[in-house]
From Swiss-Prot:
It catalyses: [thioredoxin]-disulfide + sulfite + AMP + 2 H(+) = adenosine 5'-phosphosulfate + [thioredoxin]-dithiol. Its cofactor is [4Fe-4S] cluster. Keywords: Cytoplasm, Iron, Iron-sulfur, Metal-binding, Oxidoreductase. The gene is cysH. The active site is at C231. Binds 1 [4Fe-4S] cluster per subunit. Belongs to the PAPS reductase family. CysH subfamily. This is Adenosine 5'-phosphosulfate reductase. The keyword Iron-sulfur applies. GO terms for cellular component: cytoplasm.
Length: 241
């Protein structure tokens, strides 16, 4: 069968995940590459998990499509890391996708500091709308989600029905622990965001990310004080598998 969103029912996801359940991350990437080919893209945050997934992906598809949601609000360290990734994996096709509105246009239309007044709307404009637009040519997208990251990610499967974007979402790292991620990074001497060494386990936009103190949840530095824990790219919707 064709593993595309429009042709797959919930039972089809169950079947393919049963088939793949004992495979490792490289096997999942091979399956995704063989299944989707040029219709597969990795929506990459360039976080710690991303460094592992990029390295694994380079062993399967050296000319993989990589999508970065360039909100215009990222840390300088994030942009510096992307340049290092380009040097290490020069054949990756990296798309730095920007929102329809510049920061100035957003401020003019919605007022200054939208990320404070309405963080959901800011994420919608600068991330979700961009991802929806950029995913159009593709049938499936890769993500570095891990089950242990948060309760909202605990039920993530290798192959997921993404009803928000109407695509198949493939997550090869669901069983990895944070310790394993960092062991792999150190073992293979991979580049990573220097902010990770400054108590930033999860890194997003400058205005919505702060350092996390020992004992705090790893994602507590994102949208701190707002009750918001996800930008919406991976927030589960009813009926998602």
């Amino acid at each position: 069968m064709a593993y595309v969103f429009e042709q797959m029912e919930a039972t089809d996801y169950e079947k393919v995940n049963t088939k793949l359940k004992n495979r490792d991350s490289l096997d999942i990437l091979r399956w995704a590459n063989q299944t989707y080919g040029e219709k597969l893209v990795y929506a990459c945050s360039f976080g710690a998990e991303a460094m592992v997934l990029l390295d694994l992906l380079s062993k399967i598809q050296k000319e993989a499509h990589i999508l970065f949601l360039d909100t215009d609000f990222h840390f300088a360290e994030t942009y510096e890391l992307i340049e290092r990734v380009k040097e290490r994996y020069p054949t990756f096709r990296i798309n730095m996708a920007k929102p329809a509105l510049s920061p100035e246009e957003q401020a003019e239309r919605y007022g200054d500091e939208l990320w404070l007044k309405n963080p959901d709307q800011c994420c919608q404009i600068r991330k979700l709308d961009v991802l929806a637009r950029e995913l159009e040519p593709y049938d499936a997208w890769l993500s570095g989600l891990r089950r242990e990251q948060s309760p909202t990610r605990a039920n993530t499967e290798f192959v997921n029905q993404d009803k928000r974007f109407k695509k198949v979402k493939v997550c090869p790292l669901i069983h990895w622990t944070e310790e394993e991620i960092w062991m792999y990074i150190k073992l293979h001497q991979l580049p990573y965001n220097e902010l990770h060494d400054q108590h930033y386990p999860s890194i997003g936009c400058t205005y919505c990310t702060k350092a996390v103190m020992p004992g705090e949840d790893a994602r507590s530095g994102r949208w701190a004080g707002t009750g918001k824990t996800e930008c919406g790219l991976h927030a589960p919707t009813k009926g998602d598998s």
